Amino acid sequence: MQTITVPLGERSYPIHIERGLLAKTGEMIREKLGDIAVAVVSDDHVAPLYMEEVVSSMEKVGLRVCSIVLPHGEQTKCLKSLETLYAFLCEHHLTRKDAIVALGGGVIGDLAGLPAATSLRGVHFVQLPTTLLAQVDSSVGGKVAVDLPQGKNLVGAFYQPELVLVDPDSLRTLTDDFWRDGLGEVVKYGCIGDEALFRLLEENAGGGRTALMGVIGEILTHCIQYKANIVAQDEHDTGLRMTLNFGHTIAHAVETCQHYTGMRHGEAVALGMRVITAMTEEKGMTEQGTSARLNRLLDALGMPRRLPAIPEKDLLNAMTLDKKSAGKQLRVITLDKIGVCRIVPTDVDFFQGMTAQKFVQN
């Protein structure tokens, strides 16, 4: 078992990585939190695959377990689902010494974490991420949130889990679209600060998913360790942590305009990275050839190349609600080159012309 620690003083927590780890969930939780009750939150994609195994492991060590299964998809990450979870927790009389366990991808982790942060002013929280996106990104760092019709992740909190269990075997059941969903975030890490990861992806992308699964341990370690280091330095997203949002300004605007029913988040991030890098390279802000190198990798990974047919004015309007904004100022993450990024203060006018064909297909 490999363990990466997110170092946050008294709130530090371990991220354990091991094949077959879901079967040890009960043992790991009891060792960390003692004799408690556990509410498992999952969705109707993940529950049929892993709920029985996880609940059985908990009951085997004497934990008291209740569970709830929600519809899958980004549309579930809403205030109505939050209300459903609050009612469920009250119905089962969870106390402050008990735990909410998120079993699923980024939507379930983000959603389940908010009642963990706020029910009874905070209960224990455990993440069991089963998608690539959740394992490398959303389960690490304590961001929990739901969406509003006006934008993504607009109601949320910073609430660190006490334990994260990453089982790479769960990635074998991902459909191709969920696999690409995670790859968008993986490429992001290589772009902003880990060129060794970027090269690892370049070396293996041609072999498809099989080749990437052959080095999945290295990929997970690169991503999780990088994010843990960033979170340790900037837990509340006021500076350095903003760099993790490379590609996300455009991505969130696309998702908002599509009402979270279009492409997967990681696919939208890939488009955002393509567009912003093409634009900054043309402006002389990014080393020549960076955009082409990024596009070659994203193409090899099967990521989308074209922005959806959304009016540019709608995308620009959605950007005004971006969480990285400060007043009318928008903070955009750009690349100097692969592996080196910066935060650029600007405004939405920076993105004028982003839907031009030269920026969305090279």
Name the predicted role of every residue range.
Residues 16, 114-206:
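A glycine/threonine-rich phosphate-anchoring loop and its flanking beta-alpha core
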Residues 107-114, 135-136, 253:
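Short glycine/serine/threonine-rich phosphate/pyrophosphate-binding segments
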Residues 1-99:
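ATP/NTP phosphate-donor binding region
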Residues 2, 184-186, 285-362:
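C-terminal charged capping/lid subdomain of soluble metabolic enzymes
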Residues 66-68, 101, 126-128, 163-166, ...:
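Hydrophobic/aromatic beta-strand patches that form the interior of the parallel beta-sheet core
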Residues 199-313:
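Active-site segments that bind and position negatively charged phosphate/pyrophosphate groups
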Residues 7, 93-95, 118-120, 147-148, ...:
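Solvent-exposed alpha-helices and their adjacent loops that cap or buttress functional pockets
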